[in-house]
Amino acid sequence: MPGSTTITEQAVPTFHHGRHEHGQNFLTDPAVIATFVELVTATRGPIIEIGPGDGALTVPLARLGRPVTAIEIDARLVQRLRCRLPSHVEVVSGDFLTHRLPSHPHVVVGNLPFHQTTAILRPLLHSFAWSDAVLLTQWEVARRRAG
């Protein structure tokens, strides 16, 4: 079974809005980004990032030196990310909902698009290969899933 569930309540005051049809809200708060990366640092293994957007999390995660696969649905962002990131970061152009997760242990991370949170969590919660997940979601979704 995947790692234990921990919910941290923290206000996220600053977002930069992306494309509405993709539910994009880009995280820009440096304190939240630092806390997020700190949580990921406590994990082991390759990292799968859902919806890297403009790379606010991807860039500092790449500095950890671990393999990172960032799955981005917005083709206009994929090319920009590929130009900005080192070679150990693979940027995949596609929808996470149709992406095949690896069968080996990995860490799932992401600032989930609000309108897709439940659709993303369903397959994750039924996958047994991931060891840890660090996900930023709406408070209501986190409470409902954690019981």
What does each model-identified segment do?
Residues 1-147:
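Catalytic cores of RNA-modifying enzymes
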